[in-house]
Amino acid sequence: MADPMNHSTGHQQQQKYRQYNPYQQVNLPYRKLYELPTSPEFLFEEEATKKRLTWGENLTFFTGWGYCTGSVLGAFKGTIAGMRAAERGESLKIRTNRILNSGGLVARRGGNCLGSVGLMFAAMESGVTYMRDGDDGSLTTVIAGLATGVLYRAASGPRSAVVAGAVGGVAALAAVAGRRIVKRFVPI
């Protein structure tokens, strides 16, 4: 068997033979196929300069965070209610069962409630942004909060819908103001 290394030049080892590459003469554009861009592509420069979520991402974000937040807050509230409802003389198993059942029941209700509010808010915000020709400002968020409150409590009557709309508008205004304060004073 022949040694592929030439040892005749002393300490320098030179390779006599090169490794066979079956694709050397084939010029396929496979490199271009797998060299994908890392940033999103836009048709117009105006789209690239705006930093906002698409309507689908917006919908997923607000619905998911609403459900998770409602579930955590509901579980906490249900656990406290389960602890308060415990009676003297109950065994540890029964107390634990009562706490878990109460926490799970309230967590489901809270998660579904805030998840549906998040879904409505995301839909309203995307709709208001579309109606305002893509202007995604603070006024859009406040209008979406107001409309979400009105829509959420519309089945309870007009007075309840107006109050819920005011609460939604104030909550959205507080969120916008809080976001500006955080941007100004918190170095991120």
UniProtKB/Swiss-Prot annotation:
| Primary location | mitochondrion
Cite the InterPro entries for this sequence.
Tim23-like
Q: Where in the cell is it found?
A: Mitochondrion inner membrane
Indicate how the chain sits in the lipid bilayer. Multi-pass membrane protein
* Pfam name, any one: Tim17
Q: In which tissues is it expressed?
A: Expressed in roots. Detected in cotyledons, leaves and flowers.
One Gene Ontology cellular component term attached to this UniProt record is: mitochondrial inner membrane
* UniProtKB keywords: Membrane, Mitochondrion, Mitochondrion inner membrane, Transmembrane, Transmembrane helix
User: What GO MF terms are annotated?
Assistant: transmembrane transporter activity
What PANTHER family does the record tag this protein with?
Answer: MITOCHONDRIAL IMPORT INNER MEMBRANE TRANSLOCASE SUBUNIT TIM23-3, TIM23
Q: What family name appears in the similarity comment?
A: Belongs to the Tim17/Tim22/Tim23 family.
Q: How does it assemble?
A: Component of the TIM17:23 complex at least composed of TIM23, TIM17 and TIM50. The complex interacts with the TIM44 component of the PAM complex.
Q: What name has this protein been given in UniProt?
A: Mitochondrial import inner membrane translocase subunit TIM23-3
Organism source for this protein? Arabidopsis thaliana (Mouse-ear cress)
